[in-house]
Amino acid sequence: MAALRPLVKPKIVKKRTKKFIRHQSDRYVKIKRNWRKPRGIDNRVRRRFKGQILMPNIGYGSNKKTKHMLPSGFRKFLVHNVKELEVLLMCNKSYCAEIAHNVSSKNRKAIVERAAQLAIRITNPNARLRSEENE
């Protein structure tokens, strides 16, 4: 079967691709890079001084049409079993399935086979599937 394609694939425009880093995380090892809002009374990042690192705010949000969209043009739907896969039957042109991390390899095989029958794309079909020669 040919590769499954989305119904429409709009151009995804990100307003910012660089990560927002924590103030002074480049200066000290103990301060991790993960973003934390500065709350100090004299903090220049919080007061938005020129030349300081930028803070995340509502203006950096994505376009409503392309929010949560993968580069392939699909949106992800987390699947734990074959029954949950049936939900995507009518919207297989806009949503793709992603098998949850705690699903056994036996159930993964069943999900992948059923998805092929329903023409549903899976983002991680090869995860935790061992070949026969290794068993």
Curated annotation (Swiss-Prot):
Domain of life: Eukaryota
UniProt cross-references to InterPro entries, sorted A to Z: Ribosomal_eL32, Ribosomal_eL32_CS, Ribosomal_eL32_sf
Residues bearing the modification Phosphoserine: S62
GO cellular component, one term: synapse
SMART domains xrefs: Ribosomal_L32e
Subcellular location field: Cytoplasm
Residue list for modification N6-succinyllysine: K50
Principal subcellular localisation of the protein: cytoplasm
An individual GO BP term: translation
Keywords on record: Cytoplasm, Isopeptide bond, Phosphoprotein, Ribonucleoprotein, Ribosomal protein, Ubl conjugation
GO molecular function list: structural constituent of ribosome
Location of cross-link Glycyl lysine isopeptide (Lys-Gly) (interchain with G-Cter in SUMO2): K9
Annotated Pfam families: Ribosomal_L32e
Assembly mode: Component of the large ribosomal subunit.
Annotated function: Component of the large ribosomal subunit. The ribosome is a large ribonucleoprotein complex responsible for the synthesis of proteins in the cell.
Family the UniProt entry places it in: Belongs to the eukaryotic ribosomal protein eL32 family.
Protein name per Swiss-Prot or TrEMBL: Large ribosomal subunit protein eL32
Organism of this sequence: Bos taurus (Bovine)
